[in-house]
Amino acid sequence: MIHFICALKCEASPLIEHYQLKHIQKAVLFNIYMNNENGVSLTITGVGKLAAAMATTYTYTFLQCEADDVWINMGVAGHATHNIGDIYIANRIEDVSNTSTWY
């Protein structure tokens, strides 16, 4: 299964529409959308690292995910010199709050 994690509804809406995801009413802590036929879920987390971590953990437990499921954290960001509409895939992520780096 593929699980998308998005902070905001405006980031999630195109994916919800494209994958024809339906809101799971029983998921009360976070908004989770799912389509069992195509094996896709999406969780709206709210902004911030802690919210993303809690929502991802909640989704993993609530949906009883498998170890080989795919997780994609997707969102939008702004930048002073990059053009609107440019797409980037992060291959290095730095957390300046604790100097961690992930590849």
Locate each region found by the language model.
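Metabolite-binding pocket within alpha/beta catalytic cores that recognizes anionic/polar moieties
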Residues: M1-Y103
